Amino acid sequence: MEIEEPVRVARELVDAWYPDAVAAILGGSSVTARRTSHSDLDVVVVLAGEREPSRTSLRFGAWPVELFVHTEASWRWFVRREIPRRRSSMLSMCAEGVVILDRDGTGARLRDAARESTAAGPPEATPEELEDLRYGLTDLLDDLAGCAHAGERLFIVTELARRSCELILLRTGAWQGGGKWLARRVDEVRPGFSVELDGVVREALEGRPARLVALVDEVLAPSGGRRWEGYRRSGYPGSPAPGSHTGP
């Protein structure tokens, strides 16, 4: 499947549903070498004036579509909100996407802004954030050492896998991701890590956790290793901290 096909379909959708749009960007896997027969169309539509932003999942012909409708002001508001979280799907879609409609330069302006913000990277990790993740991983490793229940082991191991990737990305100043994007992000800074992690996770789920434990300790080492005794937080946090305790 050539890139021309998803671009054509996305433009047809925009013309049919939003004839007054000033810009549109097609992002996601459909315009990259990663696209598959299951790739959907991620379409960012920009309207003039004051409109309520929206996100809609739909089907256009044979194509599944994720449609993100914004004004330039709402687009910038969402991006400003996402950047402190170190994870922005909007930046990714627009930085890596294709401008399929641009009536007044808005499309190129937002694409360039997305590329600039993406290249600048997320906010630097604080010592507290790194320590929180170290503590969370240490707590999970302790839980795994004493775990004889297959169901509990499943969730401990998957949390170890996810948080190990998050620590690598946080420590290296890279953008975070979720789902398949977490694997892609971590492989960008440590090529092959997701495949290595997959192998040791499978062993751990079968009751052989030694290689997973060793890999997590390797991930922890550049940040100071395991952290448990002496870890302390006080006050009333506004939201759960990354790496918070895994118990009830």
Language-model segments: what does each one mean?
Residues E5, V9, L13, S74, ...:
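Exposed alpha-helical structural elements
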Residues T118-P248:
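Conserved nucleotidyltransferase catalytic core and NTase-mimicking acidic/glycine-rich helix/loop elements
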Residues M1-D20, I25-S39, V44-A95:
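Metal-dependent nucleotidyltransferase catalytic core
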